[in-house]
């Protein structure tokens, strides 16, 4: 069963739109990463500097490998100056029978 993941980017004031623009090119690589099934980008309607990704990966291990790769390539470090804190990553269990 696929792994659903929510990743929240808590951006500093005024940086949400810039992050969304940067994600347009960065997510090309994400979507090509092994096990990635989909990625959707949202901004909080009441707090536009809170950017949320809803991702589906074949398995949690695929997402963990992806996050390790993003760390190794320096992307997360590059984003640090526009974030107010660490990424918030939540793994969800699907209940397709409900």
Regions found by a protein language model. Give the residues of each.
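A general secondary-structure junction signal
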Residues: 43, 91-93
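An amphipathic, aromatic/His-enriched active-site/gating alpha helix that lines ligand/cofactor pockets
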Residues: 25-37, 56-89
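Short, flexible segments with low predicted structural confidence
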Residues: 1-3, 18, 34-36
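Short, surface-exposed ligand-recognition loops at beta-strand->loop->(often short) alpha-helix junctions
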Residues: 10-19
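Short, well-ordered beta-strand segments in beta-rich or mixed alpha/beta enzyme
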Residues: 3-9, 40-67
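A short acidic, often aromatic-flanked loop/helix-cap motif at beta-alpha or helix-coil junctions
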Residues: 95-98
């Amino acid at each position: 069963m696929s792994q659903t993941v929510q990743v929240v980017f808590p951006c500093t004031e005024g940086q949400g739109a810039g992050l969304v623009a940067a994600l347009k090119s960065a997510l090309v690589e994400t979507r090509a990463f092994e096990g990635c099934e989909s990625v959707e980008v949202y901004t909080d309607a009441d707090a536009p500097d809170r950017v949320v990704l809803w991702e589906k990966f074949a398995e949690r291990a695929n997402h963990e490998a992806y996050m390790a790769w993003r760390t190794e390539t320096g992307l997360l470090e590059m984003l640090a100056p526009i974030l107010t804190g660490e990424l918030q990553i939540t793994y969800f269990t699907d209940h397709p029978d409900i």
